[in-house]
């Protein structure tokens, strides 16, 4: 286990004039699961490679437990990596693949067997131990690569780069559960890179939102969702993202809330009402169902108002083309810099 600290780290790829990572500061707690979440090209995989020793920053220090490891090679960092597409030895069977990291450490056979049996039991690998890696499904190959990661002795951290992307939703859920069981057993520090919000918010102890090589918010998943620090985070997180309307949609120009520029609210913080029963109003222009609830279509109603489009979550109602009011149960204020301010504006 290790506490991992980024201290003012910057990185630029050769041939590029723009910094990919810019003065990055982050402390990852010993034994926690941290998800780095961001759009493609935001810099999250670059950060993972810096932690793993695959890239060296031009500026700053990376520390494991206050020890500067910035210039240490990957082999000397006592870490393991799991990638989107598993890297296995196809000529070996599953048992030999899992034992390989232990054999190259020249551990006593009794120690090899002990660690091997433990990880195989937790990941339920027994039925495929004698199978050749080349004959496995993608899901099975990924489980084996995870076993290879966690079987290592003196493991300080595990880094996962989009390990579930190519799997079906059901298999993703199964594999997330297995990974979390292993991590909780070992209390190993884990960093999980993804662009999938569901993975990040359901899997991690904390989530770091990365945008253009900077950390824009670091919080527990519930806080990330309910109190985004910027309109970028509010829009990026959630399906659909947060609604944003100018503050004038709610209050007169002479209202005391002069600092507020925008009002933000989640689609589930709003409900449809009869005209005149809500502060907002607009014309229903569409409905998109994504599930059923109580045998009724449930999804997002799209409403066009004079101040912009609104999205409201709820059961289907035959309202397309009609004017409705929207009533809010909660909302947030943002300033002219798109930054969250207090509820009083």
Task: Set out the residue ranges of the language-model regions.
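The feature captures the beta-strand-to-loop junction immediately N-terminal to the Walker
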Residues: 37-39
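Helix-to-loop junction immediately C-terminal to a conserved catalytic motif
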Residues: 52
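ABC ATPase nucleotide-binding domains
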Residues: 78, 88-229
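Conserved beta-strand
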Residues: 6-9, 17-29, 60
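Conserved Walker
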Residues: 45-46
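Non-catalytic connector elements of ABC transporters
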Residues: 253-345
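Conserved coupling/switch loops of ABC nucleotide-binding domains, chiefly the family-specific signature
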Residues: 58-61, 212
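Conserved ABC transporter NBD signature motif
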Residues: 60-68
């Amino acid at each position: 286990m290790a506490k991992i600290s980024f201290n003012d780290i910057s990185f630029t790829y050769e041939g590029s004039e723009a910094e990919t990572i810019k003065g990055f500061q982050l402390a990852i707690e010993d034994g926690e699961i941290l998800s780095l979440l961001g759009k493609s090209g935001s810099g999250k995989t670059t950060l993972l490679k810096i932690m793993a020793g695959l890239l060296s920053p031009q500026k700053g220090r990376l520390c494991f437990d206050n020890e500067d490891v910035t210039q240490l090679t990957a082999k000397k960092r006592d870490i393991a990596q799991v990638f989107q597409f598993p890297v296995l030895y196809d000529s070996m069977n599953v048992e030999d693949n899992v034992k390989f990291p232990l054999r190259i450490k020249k551990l006593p056979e009794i120690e090899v067997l002990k660690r091997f049996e433990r990880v195989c039991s937790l990941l339920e690998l027994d039925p495929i131990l004698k199978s050749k890696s080349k004959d496995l499904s993608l899901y099975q190959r990924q489980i084996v690569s995870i076993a290879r990661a966690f079987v290592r002795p003196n493991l300080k951290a595990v880094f996962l780069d989009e390990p579930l992307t190519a799997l079906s939703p059901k298999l993703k859920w199964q594999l997330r559960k297995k990974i979390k069981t292993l991590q909780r057993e070992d209390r190993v520090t884990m960093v999980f890179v993804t662009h999938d919000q569901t993975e990040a918010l359901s899997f991690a102890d904390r989530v770091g939102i990365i945008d253009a090589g900077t950390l824009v918010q670091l919080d527990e998943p519930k806080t990330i969702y309910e109190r985004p620090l910027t309109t970028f985070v509010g829009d990026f997180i959630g399906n659909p993202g947060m609604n944003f309307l100018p503050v004038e949609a709610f209050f007169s120009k002479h209202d005391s809330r002069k600092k507020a520029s925008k009002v933000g609210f989640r689609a589930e913080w709003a409900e449809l009402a009869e005209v005149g029963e809500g502060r907002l109003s607009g014309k229903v222009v569409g409905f998109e169902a994504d599930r059923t609830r109580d045998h009724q279509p449930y999804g997002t109603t799209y409403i066009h108002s004079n101040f912009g489009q609104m999205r409201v979550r709820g059961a289907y109602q035959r309202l397309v083309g009609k004017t409705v009011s929207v009533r809010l149960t909660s909302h947030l204020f943002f300033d002219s810099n798109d930054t969250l301010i207090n509820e009083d504006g």
